[in-house]
């Protein structure tokens, strides 16, 4: 369900999803609590943001002085570039402003800037935002927005799901600090995983209980259980914050049981009662299907779900690679990929996935039945605890 929901998100007319204020506040406070000076005298750029509607703009404007910001810049796409089905209706905020231009309102993006006490009330807040039309349509790849990127210290936003790879590359190219929202499956993208493996990007503090709620003009296109008609929000579970800003949760080591204790007492039926952990047919590693089943005393390589990264502590584990693209040192590979025999056994056992010989997916035999492990990350303890 989660994957199909995000597919709908990618296919939505403009990937227009608005993050909840409390989720933004919870995330940003995690960085500020870990390092109270992290945002002091810094410039934050929020591209792809629709400042008139965005809770990102609202949060940072309201907390401008508390965070000690130097400057806040927020930009939006031109309505024409979003391919609205219905005629675009500008806000009263825009139409009541002397600089309102009916043509530019649909053809040009907008930029909002906060850096001074415009109202003269002795504080800098949301009432001091100043705006004007951009020269172009607000696409982050334009020279106009790229120059703003180069000026900024931080890039913070919820980019269109469909453009996540390209947007991240745009940030990384300028070596900026960032906090952005994306699909958790992006972890194993070949353009993304090396950043995680090399400790240049990690997961943020996270959404409450792992549930991300968004408002969107297309909410009713989602099924019951995803769209809540009472709140008008859609819920995605497979969404997370990606960042390169440090936070305290990242340095909390997992409390784990030994391998023997897991095999005897695990709450998971896939582990409890077994004589040993399953081993992959094509990787020199054991299959660990749950993060809380990682054995504390195993000094070899382990394959874990991508959700492990939400609990990853860099002082506790080393990330070695991923099965999704076979991005791992050859010394950990038993074969170049899935063997022809394993693939045949998989289909003989009733497997329905699409696999062929040489595929990097991690495969293993469970009670002599060939199984495929979905998107595994290979890890190893930095030091073993008995």
Regions found by a protein language model. Name each.
Residues 1-156, 160-386:
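Class I S-adenosyl-L-methionine-dependent methyltransferase catalytic core
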């Amino acid at each position: 369900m989660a994957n199909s929901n995000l597919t709908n998100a990618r296919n939505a007319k403009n990937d227009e999803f608005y993050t909840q204020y409390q989720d933004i506040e919870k995330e940003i406070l995690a960085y500020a609590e870990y390092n109270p000076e992290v945002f002091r005298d810094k410039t934050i750029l929020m591209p792809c943001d629709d400042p008139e509607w965005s809770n990102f703009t609202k949060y940072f404007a309201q907390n401008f002085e508390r965070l000690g910001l130097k400057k806040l810049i927020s930009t939006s796409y031109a309505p024409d570039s979003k391919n609205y089905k219905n005629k675009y209706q500008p806000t009263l905020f825009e139409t009541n402003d002397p600089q309102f231009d009916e043509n530019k309102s649909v053809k040009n993006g907008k930029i909002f800037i906060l850096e001074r006490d415009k109202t003269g009330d002795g504080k800098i807040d949301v009432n001091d935002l100043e705006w004007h039309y951009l020269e172009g349509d607000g696409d982050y790849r334009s020279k106009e927005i790229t120059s703003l990127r180069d000026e900024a210290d931080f890039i913070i936003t919820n980019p269109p799901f469909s453009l996540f790879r390209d947007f991240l590359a745009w940030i990384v190219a300028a070596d900026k600090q960032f906090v952005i929202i994306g699909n958790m499956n992006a972890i194993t993208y070949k353009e993304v995983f090396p950043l995680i493996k090399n400790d240049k990007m990690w997961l943020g503090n996270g959404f409450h209980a792992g549930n991300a709620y968004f408002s969107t003009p297309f909410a009713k296109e989602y099924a019951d259980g995803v769209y809540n008609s009472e709140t008008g929000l859609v819920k995605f579970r497979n969404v997370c914050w990606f960042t390169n800003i440090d936070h305290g949760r990242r340095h909390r080591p997992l409390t784990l049981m030994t391998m023997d204790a897991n095999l005897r007492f695990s709450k998971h039926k896939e582990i409890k009662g077994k004589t040993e952990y399953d081993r992959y047919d094509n990787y020199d590693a054991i299959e660990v299907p749950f993060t809380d089943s990682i054995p504390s005393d195993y000094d070899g390589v382990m394959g874990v779900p991508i959700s492990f990264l939400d609990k990853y502590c860099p002082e506790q584990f080393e990330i070695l690679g991923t099965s999704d693209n076979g991005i791992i040192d050859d010394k950990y590979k038993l074969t170049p990929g899935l063997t022809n025999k394993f693939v045949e056994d998989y289909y003989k056992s009733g497997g329905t996935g699409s696999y062929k010989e040489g595929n990097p997916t991690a495969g293993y035999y469970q009670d002599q039945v060939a199984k495929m492990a979905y998107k595994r990350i290979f890890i190893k303890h930095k030091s073993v605890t008995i």
